Amino acid sequence: MFFFRPYIGNSYYQGIQGKKILVIGASFYCPKTECIYFDKCTNTSIKNSSPYDDICPEYKANGICLHDEPTNSIENGYSTYKTFAKGLFDIVGDNNYESIWSHLAFTNYVQFFLPSNGENFRTTRANDLSERDFDAFIDVVKDLSPDIVIVWGCVINTSVKEDNKFVIDKEMLKANEDYLCHMRIPGVNHDIAIVNPNHPSSSSWHSDKERFLYYLSRALNE
């Protein structure tokens, strides 16, 4: 079961061009090194922030829990989320950040907070991932039944594409430049397109954005 409760926009089920789109990022980070729970909450061996869900001092002071971070991130409008929304302006036909995200759902793949020193946010590493994260990903997909899953970046893509037992057309990945494949999940009554652009926080996002939009348009028109 997933720990982070996905953000679900008010118009998610209306979708974009009639297609429901779930966005999957990599990780959330905690920079509060002074917190008494920091070492255990962000421990990359334990990989479990859930014991601190409703007792984290930082979140409790703001009336939220750790599991609310997907919605918290969208509402705070961090630069990565703005960059991604801007990339969808032409497809959505709207240049308003809140409006674009209202048509999407979002969560991150890794199901615990990674540590940060407050100045540098390290990239997600392969050894940060676990089977629990994949199971949580599938549970989110079953719950939200998206038509398209947009997967940010190259850290989690092997788990979601190449190693994903539910992907039905792995042989087409090379022909699709590793941007597009499809999965079929028991309990979901339609095939789901996976579109895998570069991460919006990377410099490659800007140089490859048009290629991403090409494959997203293909998925929208299937």
Residue ranges of each PLM-predicted region?
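Active-site and ligand/interface coordination hotspots across diverse enzymes
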Residues: 1-76, 136-140, 179-186, 218-222
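Structural motif
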Residues: 23, 150, 194-196
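Short, solvent-exposed loop/turn segments at secondary-structure junctions
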Residues: 26-31, 110-114, 154-158, 199-203
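Surface-exposed cleft-lining segments at the edges of enzyme active sites
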Residues: 60-79, 110-129
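A short, Lys/Arg-enriched amphipathic alpha-helix followed by its capping loop at the start of a domain
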Residues: 87-99
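Short, contiguous, well-structured surface segments enriched in hydrophobic/aromatic residues
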Residues: 97-114
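C-terminal capping/extension of enzyme domains
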Residues: 122-138, 157-222
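Proline-aspartate-enriched helix->loop->beta-strand connector
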Residues: 137-154
